[in-house]
């Protein structure tokens, strides 16, 4: 499991407005936390036109490297740590540009300047 990998995971059970069900997620951490058996992820969900200007979403189109079936968004507002037991199959990987966009969106979600973190 590496940063930028896309996996199918089962996010159920959830509460309230948490994104749910079996869906793809992008892995954000490199797996250095070997004792934790947790990974930090952001979920992927189907594209909706009214999300066009949402700064927390990164658009991702289907392609050979990500192997997604439809235009989607990486929902950076729903960043979370999940157990490795939720992971199913590896689907693919996002591009370096998409990962950069994800990091920018997460810095907006968390209200931090990404340059301050370097």
Residue positions per predicted region:
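Conserved functional hotspots at enzyme active or ligand-binding sites that engage polyanionic ligands
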Residues: 1-23, 27-118
């Amino acid at each position: 499991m590496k940063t930028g990998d896309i996996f199918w995971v089962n996010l159920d059970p959830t509460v309230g407005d948490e994104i749910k069900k079996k869906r793809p997620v992008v892995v954000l951490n490199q797996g250095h936390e070997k004792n934790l058996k947790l990974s930090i992820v952001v979920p992927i969900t189907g594209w909706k036109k009214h999300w066009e200007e949402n700064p927390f979403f990164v658009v991702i189109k289907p392609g050979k490297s990500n192997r997604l079936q439809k235009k989607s968004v990486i929902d950076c507002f729903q960043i979370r740590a999940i157990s490795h037991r939720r992971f199913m199959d590896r689907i693919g990987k996002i591009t370096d540009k998409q990962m950069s966009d994800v990091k920018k969106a997460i810095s907006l979600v968390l209200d931090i300047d990404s340059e301050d973190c370097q």
